[in-house]
């Protein structure tokens, strides 16, 4: 009976972690980006954070390389024109750091979903490159901010 509690705790922790982790689906080059009009000298990266009840008060900065490009607040969206082709590290940090690498090509369009997962104190950022179809659909549900 003494060994029941640690085994139960370990099994519960494993189930919770598996349920909370994002499902990663590899993107093919066809679905990862869309073409912009011919002759465009930049890549367009769309960042968005869908409205969720969990963590709606917490915002975090999303960086491309070394500079902040977007503030991920609940129900927000933003666009970045990136002129340097090649892989770029997109990262965010609250109590933990999350990063993804985008294979940026000029003349292409990319979508990055920013969400917030459970953390010990304030939540952990999650960044995920999504397909063009899914990104456009989710981005359409977020209102454009008025200036």
Task: For every predicted segment, state its role.
Residues 1-21:
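Sec-dependent bacterial lipoprotein signal peptides
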